[in-house]
C-alpha cells in the first residue's frame, strides 16, 4: 500500500484495465457461471451491506432467505423441507458431510461418491478425515448402483449422487440410490449444484429431488443457472433437525446459536437469487432452460455435421465431444478423459452457437484437408 492514495479517476482507470484483461463471457463456453440477470445486480447492490450471519440486525433480508428456502422446498416436492443459503456447492457439500459424520458418530467414517463427483468432496473428506470411496460410472457416465452397494459398510455415513455432472451433464440413478440408502440406513445427498435449476423445468427429466424416497439433502447453486450474483448456493434438507448437530453458541450476536459454516453471510447474493426467481417465475425459468437445452442440441447437431461425435446425450445443457482443438478466441475445457466440453449457459445464445460453429468449421475443415 502506498503512502498516498489514488484519485478516483486513477483508481478506476487501473481497475478497468485489470477488468479488461479478463475473458469476456461472449466467448466463454466452459463456465457454469454466467452473466447475472439485471434484476440480480440491482437487488445485490440494494442489499450490499447486509450480513445474514447476524440476522437479527437484518430481519427483512432474513425474510428473503426464508422465502427462497420455501420456494425450493416447493420446487423440490417437499413443502416441509428446510434449508439455508451458502456460498455455493462446495460449502453445501461440506455442511452435509459435517452433519453426516456427527450423526453417524463412528471412528472411521466413509462416504460413497461416483467417479464423476465434484472435487469439493475430496476437499471435505480431507478436512474431516473421512474416507472417500469412489464408485465407477457406466458407459453413460452415471454412477453404478450395484458397485456403490458393494462399498457400503457399517461406517458409511453418506452416499452422494449427482444431478447434472460437471463434466458430462449426466444425472446419477437417484431412485436406485434412494432405495439403497433406505435399505442401508445411510443419508443420501444429491449434488444438484448445476442440475437443480435445470431438471425441474424439463419435461421427462430424471427424478432427483425429495419426490424420490431416500433423498435426504440437495445442493443447488443460484449463481449457475439461477442467473444470480457470485457467490450463491442453497442447501436443502428433508428434515431440518439435521442442522442441530451443527449448532454452535453465538452469545454476542442477535441470535444465540448458528449452524452455518461461515460467520459473515452476504445478504446481497440471497436478495439477488430471490429477485431472479421472483421476476422470472416458473414460466420464465422454463423458457430460459428450454432455450439453453435447444442451444445444446444445436451445438451437438452442428459439431456432428463436421464429423465430431458426441460422447453422450446429456441430461442438462453440457455438451461433450471427442477431443478436437478449438480456434481462438473461444474458451472451452476438456474432461479428465480429454473430451471437449462445452456448457451452453444463458450467455451462449443461438447467435453465439452459430458463430462458434462457423469459426470451428472453418478451422476444422482446413486442418483435416
UniProtKB/Swiss-Prot annotation:
It holds the Pfam family Pyridoxal_deC. The keyword Lyase applies. GO terms for molecular function: aspartate 1-decarboxylase activity; pyridoxal phosphate binding; tyrosine decarboxylase activity. Its cofactor is pyridoxal 5'-phosphate. Belongs to the group II decarboxylase family. MfnA subfamily. NCBIfam families: tyr_de_CO2_Arch. This is Probable L-tyrosine/L-aspartate decarboxylase. It comes from Methanospirillum hungatei JF-1 (strain ATCC 27890 / DSM 864 / NBRC 100397 / JF-1).
Amino acid at each position: 500500500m502506498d503512502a498516498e492514495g489514488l484519485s478516483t479517476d486513477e483508481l478506476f482507470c487501473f481497475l478497468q484495465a485489470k477488468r479488461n484483461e479478463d475473458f469476456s463471457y461472449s466467448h466463454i463456453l466452459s463456465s457454469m457461471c454466467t452473466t447475472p440477470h439485471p434484476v440480480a445486480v440491482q437487488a445485490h447492490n440494494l442489499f450490499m451491506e447486509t450480513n445474514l450471519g447476524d440476522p437479527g440486525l437484518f430481519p427483512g433480508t432474513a425474510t428473503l432467505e426464508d422465502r427462497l428456502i420455501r420456494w425450493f422446498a416447493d420446487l423440490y416436492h417437499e413443502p416441509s423441507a428446510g434449508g439455508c443459503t451458502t456460498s455455493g456447492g462446495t460449502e453445501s457439500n461440506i455442511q452435509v458431510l459435517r452433519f453426516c459424520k456427527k450423526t453417524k458418530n463412528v471412528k472411521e467414517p466413509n462416504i460413497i461418491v461416483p467417479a464423476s463427483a465434484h472435487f469439493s468432496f475430496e476437499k471435505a473428506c480431507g478436512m474431516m478425515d473421512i474416507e472417500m470411496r469412489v464408485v465407477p460410472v457406466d458407459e453413460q457416465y452415471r454412477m453404478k448402483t450395484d458397485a456403490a452397494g458393494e462399498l457400503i459398510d457399517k461406517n458409511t455415513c453418506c452416499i452422494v449422487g449427482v444431478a447434472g455432472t460437471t463434466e458430462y451433464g449426466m444425472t446419477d440413478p437417484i431412485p436406485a440410490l434412494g432405495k439403497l440408502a433406505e435399505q442401508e440406513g445411510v443419508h443420501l445427498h444429491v449434488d444438484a449444484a448445476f442440475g437443480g435449476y435445470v431438471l425441474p423445468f424439463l419435461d421427462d427429466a430424471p427424478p432427483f429431488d425429495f419426490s424420490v424416497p431416500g433423498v435426504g439433502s440437495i445442493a443447488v447453486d443460484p449463481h449457475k443457472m439461477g442467473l444470480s450474483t457470485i457467490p450463491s448456493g442453497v442447501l436443502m434438507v428433508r428434515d431440518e433437525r439435521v442442522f442441530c448437530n451443527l449448532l454452535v453458541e453465538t452469545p454476542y450476536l442477535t441470535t444465540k446459536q448458528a449452524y452455518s459454516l461461515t460467520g459473515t453471510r452476504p445478504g446481497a447474493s440471497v436478495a439477488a437469487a430471490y429477485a431472479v426467481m421472483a421476476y422470472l417465475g416458473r414460466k420464465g425459468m422454463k423458457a430460459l432452460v428450454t432455450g439453453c437445452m435447444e442451444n445444446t442440441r444445436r451445438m451437438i447437431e452442428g459439431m456432428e455435421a463436421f464429423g465430431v461425435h458426441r460422447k453422450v446425450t446429456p441430461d442438462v445443457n453440457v455438451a461433450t465431444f471427442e477431443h478436437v482443438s478449438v480456434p481462438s478466441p473461444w474458451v472451452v475445457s476438456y474432461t479428465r478423459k480429454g473430451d471437449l466440453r462445452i456448457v451452453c449457459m444463458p450467455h451462449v445464445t443461438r447467435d453465439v452457437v452459430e458463430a462458434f460453429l462457423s469459426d470451428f468449421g472453418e478451422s476444422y475443415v482446413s486442418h483435416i484437408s
